[in-house]
Amino acid sequence: MDELIVDFNNLDSNLSIDDAKKYLQNLISRDKAIEINLKQHIKLKDDLEIQMESFDNEIPEYLTLSLKKSNELNNRISSTCQLAENLSSKVKKLDNIRERIKDTLKKVDDIIDLKNCIEGVQISIEKEDYEGAAFHINRYLSIDKSVLEDNSSEKLSIAEKKLLSMIESKYQQSLQDNDQKQVLRFCILYVPLEKPLEGIDKYCNYLKNQSKKLDAMITHYRNYIQSPKTIKPISAVSVITKIFEHFAAIIEDDLPIIKSEFGVLHCPHFILNITQQCDYYSSKVYDSFNDQFQTNKNVNDILVYKQQLEKSQQSIQDSGSGSGGGGGKVSEKIDPRNFAQFLDETSMISKATKFYEKYLIRKEHLIKSDIYQYYSKLEKEKIEKLNSIKSLIITNSRNQQLQQLPQPQQLQQQQQYQQQLQTQENKENELLKKLTQEKDKQMKQTIYSNVTKQKMNQLLGNYILLEEYFMVESVNKAIQMDSLQSLDFENNINSSNSNSSSVSGSGIGGSNTLSSSNSQQSQQSTDNTMIDFIFFVLQKSLQRAIDSHSIQTLNVICNRLCRILSQTRDNLKRIFREYIIRSSSKSVMDYQSSLQVLNNLETSSEYIIRLKKEFDSKCLKIYPIYKLDEKSKDLESSSTSSTSIEQQQQQQQQQQQQQQQQQQQQQQQQQQQEQQQENEFESNLKDDIIIIRNLLNLELKKKQENDRDQVNILSNEFLNCSKSFNKILQEEIESLFKSVQPRLKNVLNQFTLVNYEINQLEYDNNDINDPFVLQFTLEISHFFKPFQEHLSNTNYDYLVHQTIQFILKKIEGITIQQKKFTLLGGLQFGKDLRAISTYFTKISQSTIRDKFSKLNQISSFLILESISEVEDHWNENRNSPTWKLSSSEVQKILMTRIDFNHDQILKLKFN
């Protein structure tokens, strides 16, 4: 079309005829095209007009039909809603009528039951059918009080009292006959009479009568305390153990009966009653035990003695500072051996008490687990009932929303029904809350009596005080006896030295007479006895603390024991220093006493390690290692899967069918949710029961793990104490060696006088007449002799190493700074080093090769034939990890070779 359009403004005035014809033809084609388009539009207009006329005729008919259908549907829906409202109101009326009928029938049944109860009780009492009479009384107690008449209530109350009187009479008769079966029968009758605790008390009273045989045993024990020579011996340990075994057997045998006949909720009352009976007998034993050993008197005397001792020490300190007078009077010490038996038996009594307590804890966990399960079932029932009430509330509220303009009477009825449901829901919520509170209360309370535990703790408090006194005084007594015997020993030594000739020389002790040798053996035996006695006492005390099975007692005793060991270590250190000072002030130095102190330090360290091993092995049995199970902390919770509702029907176009389908879906979803909630609750109930059991076990395991941690801490204390003894031992050996270092001056002087600027003749002569090594070994042997005689092997070896290190250090300095060597002198120096090393290797228990490494390296440079070999030798060895010489030291060593040119030495490059 665009091609047919001609712009006349662009036509040229000089247009040719052919071009004009061409343009004319284009105009004709354009007109034809426009005419065709015009005809098409006219035809389209006609079609539209025809369609519009058709719509004007048909649309009103369709609209009228749709309006009619809509009105019919509206009428149907309205009638359906009205019918639903009427039906709902009638159903509610029927529900109310049904409830009233139920109440009426219940009252009728109660009246009939009341009549039967009155007749049945009288007949059962006449026949002495106590179980039947109790059943009728139980039924009477459960009847609604509103149907009871005064006359009927009075008759049944009289019958109840009469029945209780008869049961009491029969119970007393069975008690006298010691017939457990009949006693249990009449005690169980209190359960239907709604007096289960009274029944349990009566049964426990019977068990108490069965325990009277324990009175005879306690009487025997008391008589033995008063007349130990004429009465058959019996200990408090055996008495208390039999008491615990007796009552544990009662719990083990009768608890299942109480659980099945009286209910699990009354098991705690039974346990409490039995443990109170046990407390009665155990308290008698504890009191008699204290009377037997006069515990209170000993404790008071020790406290008074400690107070007087502190005042006396304070007075002495004040007197020393010039601010007070002399020390006050201190009462006589109590011999710790007087209550050694008390300590032994207290430990065993504590062990028996701990076993009894652990047994009660295990029973408590089992009972609480059953109680938790019982309350969980009740909670489940309450929750199910509460869910049903909530479902009714939701349904009623939905029906109210679907109703259109309900009548006032119907609206009022619906509101009343809704209020009833709300009231019932609140009531059930209160009951559920109360039930949960009762469960929590039952789970938190302790179901057994703690009097026995309290009595034992009081006894352990006295035990700890007496045990501390026993350890301290026994150790002090051993040290005092050792001091007295040491003074006697020194007097003997002085007297023997005055009768013997003193020998001068480089030795320490000089020559010893036979009497002095005997005195030395006596002193060594005395010191060993002191250490043995101290650790025997500490071992005994530690053993008692472990056997008590009380981690608190063990903790206190171990801490006190470690303090005593620390004091013993400090005393040994002080004594050693005093001996060193005394020995240094004498003309002939005698280190025997100080050497024995060093041996005592070593022996003490070994004893402590032995105590630690014994402590670890025994505590591992009593306080085993527990690893907390992660499954007990995080339990797998079972999850219930819910299947979605498959929609099988196709969606309908009509609104009524859609509403029906939605209602069906909502009902199905509600049922499915209720089923899912029930499954979840059952699963959660099982999980909760597992959880509460695991939590109780977890609590016990945590306590045991804490006890184990305390044991590990105490074990480390022993290890640290042993290390402190070893540290002091090394320090004092080093101190001892420093005090005797001047005695090695002659040995070092011999090396200073040795000439290493020798020729071949002198070198060969040295093989025949050794100028240094032989005399050196003799002097060293003489130096070591008293130490070897009196020191232990370990201490002696440590002193040897100290001596070797000192001598070699001095030889190293003399070699570099004072000596001059020829090649043969260097070879001689190497031979001397090997001879000295061989000698020291023989007298030493551990390797000494590393101590000679630097001197051997010095010797390796002294035997080089020429300076040209130095750099090669240096490069071969300088990267070795054991190489100890620096380049400057190597130059100094080479300078000692008289045959080497100093300028050439200085030109050496040590890269």
From Swiss-Prot:
Gene Ontology, cellular component aspect: Golgi membrane
Record-annotated disulphide pairs: none
Main location: Golgi
UniProt membrane topology term: Peripheral membrane protein
InterPro entries membership: COG4, COG4_C, COG4_M, COG4_N
Region of interest (Disordered), residue spans: 496-523
Pfam families xrefs: COG4_C (PF20662), COG4_m (PF08318), COG4_N (PF20663)
Keyword vocabulary terms for this entry: Golgi apparatus, Membrane, Protein transport, Transport
Localisation per UniProt entry: Golgi apparatus membrane
Biological process terms in GO annotation: protein transport
Keyword Transport: yes
Membrane keyword on record: yes
Domain of life: Eukaryota
Subunit structure: Component of the conserved oligomeric Golgi complex which is composed of eight different subunits and is required for normal Golgi morphology and localization.
Family statement drawn from the similarity comment of this UniProt entry: Belongs to the COG4 family.
Protein role: Required for normal Golgi function.
Name of the protein in its database record: Conserved oligomeric Golgi complex subunit 4
Organism: Dictyostelium discoideum
Gene name linked to the record: cog4
